[in-house]
Amino acid sequence: MGDYLVREQYLSKIRAGRDDTGVIKVITGMRRCGKSVIMELYAEELRRSGVPEGDIIFIDFEKFEFQKIKTSEQLNDHLHQRINPDRRTYVLLDEIQDVKDWELSLSALNAEKNCDVYVTGSNSDMLSSQLATRISGRHTEIEVFPLSFSEYMEMHKYTDREKAFIEYLECGGLP
């Protein structure tokens, strides 16, 4: 998957909710803070743990192939074609906030007892104060922040702590 920083504190929170199909795992945070990479790393973990590729549905709504999905009806149709009702399906939806009425799709997925659902989002529609009213059913929010200074040093492989700190202050903690 490339050379990405493994942000274990977030992956462990996601892992803790694995197979809890009654709970939607909502990964929030500002744009460019690493939510998509964390979700991709989790999908890779699922594969390595033996989950068949066909049981993982990963949709990145910013990718060209999925930009035609604009409404909850279109998303439901796409998912319905891929979900096997006899097997556990891991549904990972990246940047869902641009799909009209996305919360309807999440509520329908949450009603499916064999779907383990994970979503990311960046804008005000995904604010924690609104999630409870927008998503019927249970959910847990995992908020992702920009890189900490120690993560920044690890990612850029710095050995000079002082130089790294000055650059961190100038550039910020976005990966």
Residues of each region from the PLM?
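N-terminal pre-Walker A segment at the start of P-loop NTPase domains
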Residues: 1-17
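Hydrophobic positions on the alpha1 helix immediately C-terminal to the Walker A/P-loop
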Residues: 38
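Short glycine-rich substrate-engagement loop in P-loop NTPases that contacts/grips substrate
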Residues: 57-89
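P-loop (Walker A) phosphate-binding loop of NTP-binding proteins
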Residues: 30
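Conserved catalytic/switch belt of AAA+ P-loop NTPases
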Residues: 103-119, 132-133
